[in-house]
């Protein structure tokens, strides 16, 4: 065969050529590893699962099981991808051609400082991909480029970039074939490594020009080959450079119909590092809807209209805060392609055990669920989990082999004279699907059948007897080597962390004065409280706000439960969710009084008793689903409720006139951890059995049990017989592992049984519960039905009529529907209030933070509008989220609506929780603030007011930059901004050039960041705040302006003193941030990896 000519591409234009004799076959194409047509796998008549075909292709390419989830099958033109559950049916006349490709991308994924797989410790992380995946990805990218699949530009800059890629391509060939550049170029042309359009352009040049270009390429090739980089480093460089030139190569876009866009199509874009974004047809700019961890559930329903390709499908994505995105796809294949993409990213980033829809569930994952088997986790994670479970002799883990698709591994704990040890057995699966232990010939139909046989017959491994006793089953959200940690994202805590029931609740709540409360009628009694109807009056700026409230008074006879009662109040004051009751605060005058919002229709157990059979199953299902949303929110926060029952579920809206019902979960009250056995027995069957067996403990799994019992309670329509039993019989019910009577809705039986499993480890996550509830009702038919419904079947929504679609832009909040709740903060220029946006007038709308100006002259209005435009354009995990705006009559006034973060500002948070915030958490906060500032700098935004008071706390592991009232956008072509009228300024946070010349830049923000580091490591202690320290340096007898004295101090080299507990490395970063010359200060993109490295190296 003659060597390729100058015009011969390494990849042929057609992927393959199929003759008529190949009819009735399925071909899976693999990316070519060199010149010639791609390798392909062919399959004859029959049915084939997409995931099974992927496994066959992975074996052919040397892709290990750990990396299997990065790949998928697509049509040859990449117009449609197939979910793992898709079945290909090959008949006599059919010929189908598919491509096996890497679908899930993480840009910048080389190097552990960018993206990596989760490790047990910060120094035990691993790369996302190995050399076989690297080779596959390189071949895939190179094939796309030289075949013309990627659109390319032909500017001089672009030509230089693609010639550089050709040099890298040729260099890796030289490494692979152990050839010198001259020898290689005798058989391969550099033009064969270029996109077709550039190849044609060069071919059309004069001989002299072609000769000059070739000489340049040869010289560059010799320099690259002479360096020490190996072939894999060259391939990695090629991939990163190509993804930099063509970011679209790592994204997928879908044309869809969006609500409010009429007939105009919109576009959804999915990327591994940013999640889901959307854009309408007339907008080029994409707006972020959510990142993958924010997704609660995804559903596919039949859309009302029919298109040319068949029935349209409506995909609904629900975000953690209750907002939804609805997109209409032209057909089921397109909808499944999109959902499978989101589903796959969620498993890679958040939870390797979860799937959103059964239509796209990987069959191997379903098999693992049925067999109580883990995925291909490494031995380190298996042993770690056994240790976390107590290293009990006989405990074991079943997992897929990380090396072989047809093998499973049994890792068990045994007791030896030297202590616990861990032994392993290899289990093989033959082509028929039967299982056998290596060394034993007996076959078994399932893994569980094999393990049962082992329990009866016993096992010997290395001369040690294995007596299997208890299985450590997979749990939702477990961290392992299957999880990818992305760059610039919140680092995840180590696996095995047991959430504390008081993770956020160190008695932090708003105190309400007794004289602001007005008492009305008594509404009854709780287990430990007396309950009253009342009003709260608050005067702000001369205006009186009157709010209807519920008053819960702690009974003086239960003083021993007072701390638990206040912990419940503290928990509710630090969470914000539509389906959780709002706590206004606590009044400590005499008795402890919890002041909550008043929910008019009361508890749903009472409501259901009143309405009886008139309440349809569809109504009950929506109420149950809303309760699951609330508990999922708490689960994601790591906060167990501990007292889930129908009497704790309050009905805010009945659900008539086409609006769905709306519920709110009330506070947990006194925790089961402090209750006596007699009181716990009285709570059967809502209290989880383990709460009785292990007094003083409360885990998230207990809420799953309570949810199951509450679901039974809502649907049964009859009293629970068990509640009338004697205490001894109640306990016997649990001892005998009794079950509640069967409901007439058999569809719910399986879900309730899973939630009320006596083994807490086998209860599903609330995301999985929501998925199963979604499966009970579709738009095609109703599975749950009542013969005599009394209430109209409303549309299935999370937050009802107050729901805001993500694609409304700008979001306009009607002023009349913003209900004042309390004052969050007040400054020289404006105030921020907590409001509920409640267009239906029934207290079911979301909580929001609303900023308004104190003085609204024309200049202040312009500055405020600028602040709004800046915040509106920002989409970052570490910057407070813009929600919308609200206009007064005639648009004479303007208010900014933002997300509400109940934990308040970082300054106050540090002061409150100093005792439990160690250096590792402070470094995490510092890194997050730095990443937020890096994001701002990349968008030419200078904050000008960076301080701990202007950073909000979302959770104990997440902070966000807020207050953009002084922010400025740098003019194009300039790196600084001169403020003409500085007004009142936070001078003790300002850089010298800002104080003397009103010059602000990214470098001046770096100076302020150094002060924030100081605030972090002094815990914002007032006695050593920046202002206190500088004023102390100035001395008591100072005269004149503090600004002049401060400038003199800084010019003399005086700086804030190093905090006593601050690591030396952080002190050095502070001093660099406070360099007098702005050019000597490190940039945020330099500080970020340094802080990340310090966080990873810190204990804890």
From Swiss-Prot:
SUPFAM superfamilies: PH domain-like, Protein kinase-like (PK-like), SH2 domain. Autophosphorylated, leading to regulate its activity. IL2 promotes phosphorylation on tyrosine residues, including autophosphorylation on Tyr-781. Dephosphorylation of Tyr-976 and Tyr-977 by PTPN2 negatively regulates cytokine-mediated signaling. It is a peripheral membrane protein. The keyword Nucleus does not apply. Coiled coil: none annotated. The modification Phosphotyrosine is found at residues 781, 900, 935, 976-977. Its EC number is 2.7.10.2. Residues 372-472 form the SH2 domain. It comes from the Eukaryota. One of its GO terms (biological process) is enzyme-linked receptor protein signaling pathway. GO terms for cellular component: cytoskeleton; cytosol; endomembrane system; extrinsic component of cytoplasmic side of plasma membrane. It catalyses: L-tyrosyl-[protein] + ATP = O-phospho-L-tyrosyl-[protein] + ADP + H(+). One of its GO terms (molecular function) is growth hormone receptor binding. Belongs to the protein kinase superfamily. Tyr protein kinase family. JAK subfamily. This is Tyrosine-protein kinase JAK3. It comes from Rattus norvegicus (Rat).
